[in-house]
Every structure is written in structure tokens, then in C-alpha cells.
């Protein structure tokens, strides 16, 4: 699920819930200090458990991503990119995360691949498809 504020609480029991940091803050009525790097894991865990999500995946813009999936927590820093346009980045992230999850990837692999894909589409103007060969090359560089 890639939620918006209007229907933020409509997805109890979802396998993976993916707000960005702004959506999480607004949806939960929090201020920025509640979502600092130190406070984020506890906030995510509490919300994940209250909504009975298997996983909660937060995109953090220039800070990367944070994922709490089942019993594993993963923080992945952003990769340095020349950002042209963020349109479609969230859709790319949830699409890659869903595919990786369906393929049996670990939470760390899901977070890393989705983070890479979201960053790659931000290098182009407008909403663009992710180029699979480019994602594969970037992912190969992680080893």
C-alpha cells in the first residue's frame, strides 16, 4: 500500500505499508521530533503493530529508507544522485518492494532494491519507467 492522508488508516492487516516521511508525520499527527533518526524505529514499530501490518517501509528522501518487516529492521542510506524530479519515485519504490517481496527477497534486499529504484527514477524528468538493466547494474554494485 502507498497511502495518502485521506485513507491513512484504511489498510489494517496489509502486508507492506509504504508512506513517505511527510505522509507518516501527517497521518499520525506527529511533529518532526517524533520522527528523528532516533525516534523513528519506535514510532514505526508502534504504528505497524497497531495496524497489524507485516511490514512498514518509510521513504526518507535524502536520508534513504527505513523498513520494519516482520521481526527485522533495516535502515538504508540514500545513494548520491543528481535529482531532476521526484515524480513517480514512491510508485517505483512500492512496485519494486512488492516484486522483491513476492520473489522471496529478505527485508534488507527489498529495502535496498526499492531504494535504488526510487533514486534512479528521480534522475529523469517526469514519471518514467524503471530500466531493469540499469537497476540490475546498480544492484550488482552493492555486493
Residue map of PLM features:
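Conserved phosphate/ATP/ADP-binding segment of small-molecule kinases
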Residues: 1-73
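Conserved post-catalytic alpha-helical subdomain immediately downstream of the catalytic base
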Residues: 46, 51-54, 79-142
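C-terminal catalytic "cap/lid" subdomain
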Residues: 60, 142-143
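Hydrophobic residues at beta-strand termini and immediately following loops
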Residues: 76
